[in-house]
Amino acid sequence: LVKLCLFDSNGFVANSFNPRLTQGLPDVKRGAILDINGKAIAQDEANSDGSYTRKYDETGNYAHVVGYTVKGKAGIESKYNFRLQTVSNELLQRIGHVFLGKEIQGNNVVLTIDDRLQQVAAEALGHEKGSIVAIEPSTGKILAMVSYPTFDSNTVSENWAELNSDDENSPLLNRATQGLYPPGSTFKIITAASALEVSQKYMDFNFKCTGDAKFGDSILHCYDGKAHGKVNMTSAFAKSCNGYFATVAEEIGNDQLIKTATDFGFNTDLNFPLEYKKASFALKSDSDVKELAATAIGQGKTLTSPLFMAMVTSAIANNGSMMQPYIVDHIETPGGSVKNRTLPTKLLQACDSSTAHQIADMMCEVV
């Protein structure tokens, strides 16, 4: 009981399924959710009877980020439920309500997302299943995050059964944070970093690509079986040569690749406010060469989310330093005061700055 009262009480109070948060404050106008420039993404609108209806951006661009407040809660609406329902200067607000007819309003939540970038990301994704995540490398600030298929937060209650039964499209799934996929050739960033952390000699490691290579009892092919000829690390990275990076992984060994993947944050909790699944790296010290080769090129059992791979590339752009990703910039009181501004925090050092610079240069060769 002591533990419950002293240590766990805040968690229970803030829980999105706590009915007291909505039933106890029927006259409170729930705070708005805003983009970084102050555009309302979700806000309460007053009804004639004094109640409020939650209204959302109708594009669907923010559905997975903002979430909803019916059938339970999801997204920012869930994680920041307590903040949105909390009344700052409650006594003064209630006096203003009684004598001046002013609304009693909860705090606003201001996102790091820029609506202009969010629109660009949504247009680029179109109707392709997947997601786009944009991060500011030096801070970890999420500038855009979209997922498709999406849904309309305004009509979740009416469409609840359909949204939950659509297994083919899974519209409620935030693919940016909850979708786990093989990273494919983007994992070659990890393999390259792993080799360079061992020795700079791998920058000049040469390999003759014939379009396929044998690892154990498995034949590994380059895309379309194309032979790249003689390549070093830079040209192999630019051409995405599977044989090269599988061979390099065989040279450095399982334990080194495991170490680098761990250094980059695979299998690590992110402490991110939206529901997420952590990146999974399953290679073991005694895994055979076939599995090692597949892992080195982003296949095998490795699974990661778009958010996490955006963090990986951001670490390369930030001198090897991976920042804690965040999507809420600050809390804003009804009077406009800023509270609880999120400060950039370093999550981990993924690799040396010199290694990051070399990989960044190689990434430019891909474009």
Please report, for each region that a protein language model flagged, where it lies by residue:
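Periplasmic/cell-envelope proteins involved in peptidoglycan metabolism and beta-lactam response
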Residues: 1-160, 171, 180, 205, ...
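Beta-lactam-recognizing serine transpeptidase/beta-lactamase-like catalytic domain environment
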Residues: 138-185, 190-367
